[in-house]
């Protein structure tokens, strides 16, 4: 009889672990999506800067007179 009571508890523990894992995976996926959105925004800003003023942008990185 005691073994019959242990199985549901073990199954319940596994279910709770599965739920915790699923929650963690969902949070990680959401964070990855947020980071991708931020990166896309940064790349869009760079692209628009290059489209409107590429020469000035490049010149800001070029050293002059051996500096």
From Swiss-Prot:
The N-terminal unstructured half of Pup provides a signal required to initiate unfolding and degradation by the proteasome but is not needed for pupylation, while the C-terminal helical half of Pup interacts with ARC to target proteins to the proteasome. Pfam families: Pup. HAMAP family: Pup. Residues 1-38 are annotated as: Disordered. Strongly interacts with the proteasome-associated ATPase ARC through a hydrophobic interface; the interacting region of Pup lies in its C-terminal half. There is one Pup binding site per ARC hexamer ring. Protein modifier that is covalently attached to lysine residues of substrate proteins, thereby targeting them for proteasomal degradation. The tagging system is termed pupylation. The gene is pup. Belongs to the prokaryotic ubiquitin-like protein family. This is Prokaryotic ubiquitin-like protein Pup. InterPro entries: Ubiquitin-like_Pup.
């Amino acid at each position: 009889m005691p073994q019959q009571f242990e199985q549901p508890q073990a199954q319940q523990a596994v279910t709770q672990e599965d739920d915790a894992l699923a929650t963690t995976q969902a949070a990680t996926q959401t964070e990855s999506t947020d980071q991708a959105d931020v990166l896309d925004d940064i790349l869009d800003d760079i692209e628009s800067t290059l489209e409107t003023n590429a020469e000035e942008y490049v010149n800001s990185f070029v050293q002059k007179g051996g500096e």
